């Protein structure tokens, strides 16, 4: 359960915002890791389109759950969003203040193992493929 280290790191409070790409098996961990009055933004469904959802925990924490997609947005909207993200986060990403979690690294020859890990939804963070 990935929520446990998040709760430990925040003194049991949880985080104010989760930007989530996976869903399905991770829904309830997200709810557990989100602070009271926090927000979860669902931007992807890599783990599937359906899953368990603890409505009692959602209500008790008064969490805002926001769904977004780029499929129904125009090219101009996508460009504006990309520009805003770069302006808001670009410097911190470049300075190393923000970083994406790295789950694992595989040689390109082991791409099937990497894909199996991803399909099994066993990873937390990015899976990197390296070229020798």
Features from the language model and the residues they span:
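Substrate-positioning beta->alpha
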Residues: 20, 109-110
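Short catalytic-loop micro-motif centered on adjacent basic/acidic residues
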Residues: 16-19, 39-43, 100-103
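Short acidic-hydrophobic, aromatic-tinged amphipathic segments that line or gate anion-handling sites
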Residues: 1, 105-109
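Adenosine-nucleotide cofactor-binding segment
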Residues: 1-26, 78-80, 84
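Generic hydrophobic alpha-helical segments
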Residues: 2-6, 89, 114
């Amino acid at each position: 359960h990935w929520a446990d280290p998040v709760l430990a790191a925040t003194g049991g409070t949880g985080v104010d915002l989760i930007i989530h790409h996976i869903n399905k098996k991770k829904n309830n961990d997200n709810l557990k890791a989100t602070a009271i009055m926090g927000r979860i933004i669902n931007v992807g469904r890599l783990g599937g389109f359906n899953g368990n959802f603890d409505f009692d925990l959602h209500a008790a924490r008064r969490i805002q759950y926001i769904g977004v997609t780029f499929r129904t947005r125009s090219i101009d909207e996508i460009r504006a969003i990309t520009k805003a993200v770069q302006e808001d986060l670009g410097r911190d990403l470049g300075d190393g203040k923000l970083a994406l979690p790295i789950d694992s690294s595989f040689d390109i020859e082991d791409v099937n193992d990497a894909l199996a890990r991803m399909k099994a939804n066993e990873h937390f963070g990015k899976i990197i493929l390296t070229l020798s």
